[in-house]
């Protein structure tokens, strides 16, 4: 438990990364236990609301043909190949959203289109960061995702990176530190009543970290109220203390930031986090702005993990 002035934020101590902790906020999704040891048939039957008669029909076809349950259901027109793929993903604890259950932003390609080229690009980014920042056997720094200008795709990259890290099974926290134009709560369809700004000003409720529905290992700390003094809040010692505390409680901490054009916030946040990755939009971001941002980190106590050129 970490204290900031007169306010206290409750952070549940992490369990082993393969077993995510219970939800941290009311109304959050349940644990992944519901899918442990469930058969493909059970998952497909629930997904497609199959009646007992339909299930028996599939089982009979399965016995007659020697097909697997999923294959038999597809052959009878009671399920699709995507349904079978989703059921397999559930068995292997690989969370993603099938088409009819997609309730979050279309920007979340790692969740909505996990087998697409765009999702694969985020897995490639994850692999690089696992080697450069999130190395085994150490307390990982928080990773700030920064960009020169609005529209570079910073929130898009931070959100999808957080999803892909959570899909590894480790407890992952996405912090929205963009106290200028916050968007993370919109991307994940979460409440934004209390959050980071309240913690740093000493007036937040205890339960400010929310679990993302359908992704047991992913949690979000939204901005909360947009403050009039965002740069001053992140420059206070409490912000650095909070980042260190969160980094010790979660396997991965990703921090979304304001665009550099708004002020020094993003450079300060990167220094407090300890690591950063820069996002630039291909054929859109200005080279001079990118150079200035990278130069602003020179001499700061931050590891620059690389530059991501966003093509989407």
Report the location of each language-model feature:
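P-loop NTP-binding module
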Residues: 2-35, 39-65, 75-93, 97-98, ...
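Compact, charge-rich alpha-helical regulatory domains located at protein termini
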Residues: 69-71
């Amino acid at each position: 438990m970490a204290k900031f002035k007169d306010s206290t934020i409750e952070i549940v101590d992490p369990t082993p990364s393969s077993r995510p902790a219970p939800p941290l906020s009311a109304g959050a999704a349940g644990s992944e236990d519901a899918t442990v040891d469930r058969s493909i048939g059970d998952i497909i039957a629930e997904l497609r609301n199959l009646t007992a008669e339909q299930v028996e029909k599939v089982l009979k076809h399965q016995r007659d043909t020697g097909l697997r349950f999923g294959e038999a259901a597809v052959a009878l027109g009671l399920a699709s190949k995507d349904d079978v793929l989703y059921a397999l993903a559930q068995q292997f604890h690989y969370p993603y959203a099938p088409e009819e259950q997609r309730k979050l932003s279309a920007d979340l390609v790692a969740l909505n289109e996990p087998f697409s080229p765009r999702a694969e690009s985020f897995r490639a980014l994850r692999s690089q960061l696992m080697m450069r920042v999130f190395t085994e056997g150490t307390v990982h720094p928080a990773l700030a995702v920064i960009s020169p200008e609005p529209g570079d795709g910073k929130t898009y990259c931070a959100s999808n990176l957080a999803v892909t890290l959570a899909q590894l099974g480790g407890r992952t926290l996405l912090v929205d530190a963009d106290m200028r134009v916050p968007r993370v709560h919109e991307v994940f369809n979460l409440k934004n009543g209390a959050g980071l700004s309240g913690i740093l000003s000493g007036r937040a409720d205890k339960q400010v970290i929310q679990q993302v529905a359908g992704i047991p290992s992913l949690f979000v700390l939204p901005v909360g109220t947009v403050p009039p003094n965002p740069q001053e809040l992140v420059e206070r010692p409490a912000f650095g203390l909070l980042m260190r505390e969160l980094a010790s409680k979660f396997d991965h901490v990703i921090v979304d930031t304001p665009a550099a054009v708004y002020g020094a916030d993003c450079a300060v946040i990167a220094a407090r986090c300890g690591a950063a990755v820069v996002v630039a939009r291909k054929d859109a971001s200005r080279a001079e702005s990118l150079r200035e941002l990278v130069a602003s980190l020179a001499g700061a106590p931050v590891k620059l993990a690389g530059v991501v050129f966003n093509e989407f």
